[in-house]
Structures are given as structure tokens and as C-alpha cells.
Amino acid sequence: MYQLFTANSKTEKILREYINSRENIKNKLDKLKENPYKANSAHQLHGKLKGKWACWLGSNIRAIYIIDLKNHQIIIEAVGTHKIY
């Protein structure tokens, strides 16, 4: 299982707000920790975000993250609507 981190305090604050306002996001984060490659329709990004991953945390909420294989960590860089791309 992977550990979950945020890249900065702004992302952490936004993620906490979503967790507090939506019941199912915590469950989706748990699924992400189990398998960051397939959970919540995870997919690799292209273009300027190449090397990063994205997944759905809710109907219109996405997370952009990096997978650190060596340390078994998921580092969430951004959370929000599709505008975060």
C-alpha cells in the first residue's frame, strides 16, 4: 500500500475541504493508496503534465499526482475541477 502526501499546504487545504464536504472522497483516496494505477479511473497525463497521473475523486473533482515507486508514495500536486489541468 502507498502512503499519501500533498505537494504543498495549498493542495492540502483544498483536499481537506473536499474531504469534509463530500462523504465518498475518503473512500476514493483509500482506493488510490491501494492501487494508484487503476483506482478511480486513473490515467497518465500527456503534454506539459507528462509523467503525472490523474484520477476522479468525485463527479467533477480530480486529483493530479506523482507516484514515487521507490518510497511507495503518492504525492498529490493539485485537486479540483477539470480547470486544474
Can you say where each PLM-predicted feature lies in the sequence?
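Enriched for short, Lys/Arg-rich terminal
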Residues: M1-R16, K26, A39, A54-Y85
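Hot-dog-fold acyl-thioester-processing enzymes
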Residues: Y18-R22
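Short amphipathic alpha-helical segments
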Residues: E23-L29
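A short, surface-exposed loop/turn module that caps and links secondary-structure elements
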Residues: D30-C55
